[in-house]
Amino acid sequence: TEKIREGGVMYSDYALGQFFEEASKKPWFEKTLFVIVADHGSGAENELLRTSPYSHTVPILFYMPSAGLKGITDQTMSHLDIMPTLLPMLGVNDSYVAFGHDAFDPSSPHFAVGYYDGTYGIVDGDLFYQFSERGLESLFNLKADPHKKIDIKERADPAKVHLFEAYIQQYYRTVAERAFTPESWGKEVAQ
């Protein structure tokens, strides 16, 4: 399996190289914003990397040749943050519905939400919250306890728990009501 994984990485590297070699010859290349991201982790040989939330850790790359964007960050973000990050980069200021945040806005909260092992998991800095329909099930400090052996749920910040529960509830409401556009929110929310 390690050889298969290595082959997949080598192929991806080759394919991206070929793509960018051809794309760089096109007139639209310089002003195009490219987003490169995986949809899941690699299933690495490391046991820890096969558990949540690590199994969903992937890099994301924003590349626009004419923008001169440079830098690396290890801040928490997720696929949900891609659209809210791209729109300001592209100069779009219209209203939109999104459950993510602008990764480059320091005033935005930076947490990632995923569905792991039958629970909603939220990574917020070093903390990993796990929620079920009953509420907060567990809380781990990933930096101090990467193998998630010590549940520190009793030390959870009630304001954060409330925020994350509201986030999950709003997600369900939006999906159930198919409220994906500002027009579908109702006048009191859209303004």
Predicted regions and their residues:
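Solvent-exposed soluble domains appended to multi-pass membrane proteins
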Residues: 1-191
